[in-house]
Amino acid sequence: MKPTIALVGRPNVGKSTLFNRLTRTKDALVHDLPGLTRDRHYGHGKVGSKPYLVIDTGGFEPVVDSGILHEMAKQTLQAVDEADAVVFLVDGRTGLTPQDKIIADRLRQSPRPVYLAVNKGEGGNRAVLAAEFYELALGDPYVISGAHGDGVYYLIEDILETFPEPEAEEADAKHPVFAVIGRPNVGKSTLVNAILGEERVIAFDMAGTTRDSIHIDFEREGKPFTIIDTAGVRRRGKVDEAVEKFSVIKAMQAVEAANVAVLVLDAQQDIADQDATIAGFALEAGRALVVAVNKWDGISEERREQVKRDINRKLYFLDFAKFHFISALKERGIDGLFDSIQAAYNAAMIKMPTPKITRVLQSAIERQQPPRAGLVRPKMRYAHQGGMNPPVIVVHGNSLHAISDSYTRYLTQTFRKAFNLQGTPLRIQYNVSENPYENAEDKPKKKPLRRVSLSNRIEKREGRKEEKNRFKKKTKVSVKKQFSK
């Protein structure tokens, strides 16, 4: 699995800026107001062939006993427990503060490796900036600049050196590898028990650490499956809800290692933002998805209609996924769930012939042309498959940058229906034919127009008249000579 790096530090030391640098995005809000990043934010990064996950935590206020800052501190401690490495960020301009010392004391108690990074070090003397932070006893400080990127590469390179090279992904397996994901207490443990059997689960519960993730191979109705069982989703005991509700690292890691994700929802609870967040991770990773709405047997008909309305409203972006209304405790609906897992896997791994893809594209264009963007109408010529898990269709043509999102959705639905792509995301990429004269500098230079003055034009005209007169005189002379002879 990808190593997870947690960014920890007091408010306004530049964690969100460093997060943006490491993930090459601007997903985390960046502002000078201390404490702006309220909850943990997650992103993907890669150095060479080594991918990683980054957690952008809220500002660490360990001395506060109540209020939102206290909740942010608890989330940070949870992030430290779940991460594989911790980057402790301090402010090189402000210098060492008492709060930095308190945070360092907490981090020294953690079994995770801690890397001390002195941020905002651009333009300064590195030795001078780092000197006072040796007092924290966290090793040699890295002087970096999250805003400008100075020293960031060496920091991440040193962190990733301690982790092995990534092995071939389990997602490339020749059979469904699925992970059961979802919020706490929605019935993931009960579903895992229903799938594997109580004794098998208890045996695996006895081994491993809180960071272990177990791959269990099994067969159902003669078909092979592998379930990714993340530690801590079964019998964790009572966990602080304020911390646990933001814990999605295990879900992210499980999704990365699987080729199908099974999202479990609780029919007895309202659809929460965290449900949509976890579903979004699976969608962003391009994984096939099956949704299991658990505890369906314990609610009234009126509540069932309400749940369906909430799903349509809050999980509208999962229109490609198959929803199953099950009871894991009574093992109802499990067979249909496995049928959808197999179908979603088949759709994610489908191989589509190029001629058929192009025919479907041309048929879609005949039914509905892409709308104009100003004076330009996009022209799509042909398409082919560009990848699997998820399926990718690459469309070639001209002016494809002008294709609207609504038309892309139209093409997506058309391809999905033509190839029966149920349960998997489908991505469409536009490959625009290059225009060699796109840049003004590359255009062939036109010869400048010659501006001829009026006097020059008159002289040329007079010269032509004189030449005509001379020609006429010569003609008359030659005619006279002929007659004289």
Curated annotation (Swiss-Prot):
UniProt: GTP 2 binding residues: 182-189, 229-233, 294-297
Boundaries of every KH-like domain copy: 350-434
Cysteine disulfide links: none
Annotated keywords: GTP-binding, Nucleotide-binding, Repeat, Ribosome biogenesis
Residues reported in the UniProt entry to bind GTP 1: 9-16, 56-60, 119-122
GO MF terms held by the record: ATP hydrolysis activity; GTP binding; ribosome binding
Function text: GTPase that plays an essential role in the late steps of ribosome biogenesis.
Known partners and oligomeric status: Associates with the 50S ribosomal subunit.
UniProt name for this protein: GTPase Der
Lineage summary: Bacteria, Pseudomonadati, Pseudomonadota, Betaproteobacteria, Neisseriales
